[in-house]
Amino acid sequence: MFLSAVTFAKSKSKTILVKMVSQAGTGFSFNTKRSRLWEKLTLLHYDPVVKKKVLFVEQKKIRSL
């Protein structure tokens, strides 16, 4: 019996870490996770610079989880 080193393709993770950026123009951002199957996130979240809830949009994918 011969054993060989076989490299299998790594499966993609179900969730990804994304960077959310404030649309108020303050430059405030935070990271959150979302499902890989969902469309890009858009949500209301508290921005401490303007001290209000403002719209945050997904800027980029950071990594897979």
Curated annotation (Swiss-Prot):
Listed Pfam families: Ribosomal_L33
Annotated compartments: Mitochondrion
Main location as per UniProt: mitochondrion
GO aspect biological process, one term: translation
GO MF entries: structural constituent of ribosome
Transit peptide, UniProt annotation: 1-8
Keywords: Mitochondrion, Ribonucleoprotein, Ribosomal protein, Transit peptide
Any one GO cellular component localisation term in the record: mitochondrial large ribosomal subunit
Quaternary data: Component of the mitochondrial ribosome large subunit (39S) which comprises a 16S rRNA and about 50 distinct proteins.
Family: Belongs to the bacterial ribosomal protein bL33 family.
PANTHER family assigned: 39S RIBOSOMAL PROTEIN L33, MITOCHONDRIAL (PTHR47037), LARGE RIBOSOMAL SUBUNIT PROTEIN BL33M (PTHR47037:SF2)
Name recorded for this polypeptide: Large ribosomal subunit protein bL33m
Organism of derivation: Bos taurus (Bovine)
Name of encoding gene: MRPL33
